[in-house]
Amino acid sequence: MRGYGEEGFTLIEGMIATVLLATGLLGLASMQTIAMGRNGDANEKTRVTNFAVEIIERIQFNRRNALAYNGIDTSVVCTINTTTQPMARGDCDQWRNLLTGQLATGLQNLRGQVVVTTVGPTLPPLNQNRVVVTMSWMGDAGEQKLATARSLSITAMVAPE
């Protein structure tokens, strides 16, 4: 029993403090794990976005022949005619090599698709094209989970000079 004026921790108080500290540390460790996983997701999305922007910039540079890029699918060999559209064919081949090369390491089953459609009719005719680039891949979910299917679409308008 405590006498008058005695102070200090009892065993129960010490155990409660230990439980609270342990709970806080477990919560902190859990938040760190979640943050690391989200960092990996952000890294994947940044890399995939850069790959998509790569082909959009190539289409904008060759804007007069933007419709030649319609139907590009990196999972198959490029079908653009080399004789009539050499620049578009080169862009298609280079983009396909980029998505299957060393820069795409860690992105499983990375696939890029391009759809180009004419916008219109408008008065006066603006000759604009809508470019939709869709990227799909299997995301890395860590060591203990299965990879998850992910996709990203970017839309851009390409106007004549």
Mark where each language-model region is.
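Flexible, low-complexity segments enriched in proline/glycine/serine and punctuated by aromatic residues
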Residues: 37-161
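Aliphatic-rich helix starts adjacent to a transmembrane/signal segment
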Residues: 2-5, 9-53
